[in-house]
Amino acid sequence: MKSLGRAALAVLAALGLSAAPAGAQATDATVQTPADALAQDAGEYAARYGVPIDEAMRRLRAQEESVAATDAIARRFADRLAGVSIEHAPAFRIVVLLTGREPVAEERVLAGGMAVPVVYRTGASATRGQVVAAIERFQAEIRAAMPHAPSFGLDQRTGEMVVTVNRSDVDAYGHDAMSTDLTLTTRVPVRLRSVDRVGDLSIDGGARVVGVSAVDGRRYACTTGFVVTDGAQAGVVTAAHCPDALSYIGPGRRETPLTFVGQWGWGYQDVQLHLAAEPLRPLFYADSPKTLVRPVTGTRSRYTMRAGDFVCHRGERTGYSCAEVELTDFAPSGDLCGGACTPTWVTVGGPVCRSGDSGGPVFIGTTALGLVKGASYAADGTCNFYYYMSTDFLPRGWSVLRQPQPVPVTPPAPDRR
């Protein structure tokens, strides 16, 4: 797939990679420890929710350490589960939405040094699986019936299928009439959300590599996300809608050609892979001025993402920012995935995203989550949300390169002879 979205921007400056050759990373930035990385994200959390920094640190640790618990809850209530969400105000807690009326008592999960409340709400009219199945079954039919192709996604807070439609279509059809028709068609609860545009972000993203487009012959900049490996060699990934022939821009604006391996841009993927002649380390830029790089110590599967999860991204146009996950199981509008997109993308709330952030890394602490693909904008250019491809969908045989973690050494038992 070679979709440039809206008009891509010509290269204005050469500014270094998110995932860079080892030499460039070592000279350009300080490597954070995992604790430093989490503290940086906690600063954003504290500012957003008005809590002390130590409380923000506890909550972010609890958010990540509670994933195994919510996965177990999802398995336990597999036939009733409509969604799992994280609430940050007025207090930090986990909310589980179930179908049926049988109540479930509140529980507590020990995570991050906190006893996190788990609250169960009942009465949802469809399970997560039923909503996703409805998106897959009726997406093409609904797209064909509307002047502008809508997008679809699951809101795990409410258990609803959120249909994001063009504002002009809602005005012409009527909000209530459209909502009723979609609910009757899909047989699951539907909520409409009207926007002006959902599409790919411009190919001028989270950090710079440059190349010439085969479509128009112009020179463009694009982004890289994380360093990846197949076990024998390492490469960098970026968005599939970038030029194939790319060069890394290093210190002094020195260009180092990257070797194109392949691209995958259909349905659930938007990724291409390049190899570099220089050695690569599992680091990525995570601050706006590119003075700090983080190691990658782990990844997190798309299916474990919960509405309300607090995540961060870095884009060349917008720098570093953090916000909440909104929709999981999201299918972007139009033919942005070499045809219709599958409901496998994840959206994150705005307003900090702009044309130019495509391909940038999405993460929390030192955990890699995915690569930014596109966004939705209001008429005034404000970002409603961006959406990303999970690291689950990297090319077959490739995975995110991780920094080895020290193995705790247990001292020998004292000799009591």
Cite the ranges covered by each PLM segment:
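Secretory targeting and sorting signals
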Residues: M1-T27
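Primarily hydrophobic membrane-targeting regions of prokaryotic envelope proteins
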Residues: L15-A19, L97, V163, D357, ...
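Non-catalytic extracellular/periplasmic "stalk"
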Residues: E107-G113, V119-V236, S247-G265
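Terminal interaction modules at protein C-ends
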Residues: R193-R417
